[in-house]
Amino acid sequence: EIKLPVTEILEELKLILKGHHEAILQAPPGAGKTTLVPLALAREPWLKHKKILMLEPRRIATRAAAQRMADLLQEPVGQTVGYRMRLDTRVSSNTKIEVITEGILTRMLQEDPSLDDVGLVIFDEFHERSLDADLALALCMKGRSLFRENDPLKIVIMSATLDSHKLEELTGATVIRSEGKQYPVDIVYGKASEPRDSINDRTVAATLQALADHPKSSILVFLPGQGEIRRVADSLMTELHHRKIDGVHLRPLYGNLSLEAQQGAIAPVPKPGERKVVLATNIAETSLTIDGVDIVIDTGLAREPVFDPTTGMTRLHTRKISQASSTQRMGRAGRLRPGRCYRLWSKSQQGQMAPHATPEILSADLTPLALQLLQWGINDPMELTWLDPPGSGPWLQAVSLLVRLGAIVTGSNGLQLTDHGAQMVGLAVHPRLAHMLICGQSIGHTKTACLIASILSDRDPFGRDTPDMNERIDILLGKSACPNQHRGWFRRTHQLAENFSAQIKQLVIATATNLPEPYQVTGYLIACAYPDRIARRRHAGGFQLANGRGASIPGNHTLKQSRWLSVAEIGGLARSKGDMIRSAAILDETLFESLLADQVTTNTIVEWDGRTNRFIAEERQQFGDLILSRNKLSKVPADAKGKALIKHVQTAGLDPLPFTPEIRQ
């Protein structure tokens, strides 16, 4: 028996779920909702011996929640309480509570839309509004209405900061609020932050001051990304050494770290009297109690993936956090004792922040969502009930890409999933990479395809060092040495590649009639996943992509001299005209005549030449916006002349046309 603030509302929650199918629980950080709610509901009669699934937004929170509950039951993880996440599952036939990452639930719903052996799904930290969580909630509600009329699936949505009014309207659920027992946190605002301000300098100065003012405290610092964490850590290390400050451990905490390294950041310091500074992304906002922390330093920034519909690319944007996120971060200082939160912005700027973060469904690439829904037989996303429905533009763009990848076709009954598309759904990866894996199997190069897919499914530690995908593959194959600092990446990537290989071997895939030469394989496979990013060299280091964008390779890498590239990863600013190529491989242009020939189009182009005052016509072979060849036509198609004149007038006006004075008047 353990007493935490949420204990006070558990009986009320049980009573509501006895007579209703949904409930919303709003409780502050540290109230105990993640640990106690599943345990309290596990023996309710209405559960009928079925399982409880609890979704967590991150892997470290998934494992930590399962471990805490198992500890309370004095059992190992995998007995009554277990967890499921990619590449790591600990459950047994005795498991009644499964803590899972959000993507796992969507795959479970594809295999069994009714979730027949599940009695309750708990959405924890739902305020984060990830695409997977929104999709899973919509599919749970749809599956319940279709398949669980007599034994409805129950749903509990939990968070500390939540727009509960929208959820009430959507689900009709009763809202329960636990006041909790948050220790008081003193908030200290800084001067107004400016875009040109150095995050590194302000954060280092604030951290050093906090170490001096609170000599017994450990500190949690929120930074937008891995790069900032590395730079702040380097600066702090130098300053601590210069000032002869001992007994302070610097611990990074971000998603790309191994689970063991993440666990090291939240664990106690090695010796009494020592302390730590945890440099974290927003991974530390929710579901974690970091031992010893009662001081928070918040930069007020986060890095989020944003899909750019004009280019079809997803970029990481550094943005100001919402008021809800700032509350979550502040709460980290009051989990164990009274604390203090230093906000590196002014009080007036706090009032200008958005109340809640933008849901991912409104800014994400919808291709994975579209493929999932089409597998369910849903042609129109509006057939589901959403908190925020996906936009029609991004939806149509996602459908267009799936058509290009051969996943769907347009039939008499609307959009239909092809056999190829059904195989793509079964692979737990973005549809682009699923298509590439199947293509790799068809040409007899499954291993290379699995390595590329695993490299692109994780954060790339070599982005600053080399743009050549083959150099990464050589490291994984043991042809080149792996730097010591990337050994964790090496293990994770191999493990993921083996997982992809096991999945792809379960599929029956026809062998391709055209097979590439070994030196063509990497470029071809990347082109399968990213046909819109095939690039042709136009000047030293500069390339034009098939989607019309410009891109360049930084530094002096030999790939700069290549005539054709297949680009896997790209970066840049949304409004800039050019992007930076992060990883790519040489593409053999003879593939346009063989394996890529089905994507080459033949177009007749007619234009008015203002210099010679006549029509010119040519036939172009194109791959997207890239012209492969052009042949002049001796005869100009009559039906194209009018359009050519209109286009010329729209850009140049009437003056260049050879009109007589009488006609001009």
Residue ranges and their predicted role:
Residues E1-M436, A512, G571:
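P-loop NTPase motor module signature
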Residues G247, P252, I297, P305, ...:
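Second RecA-like catalytic domain
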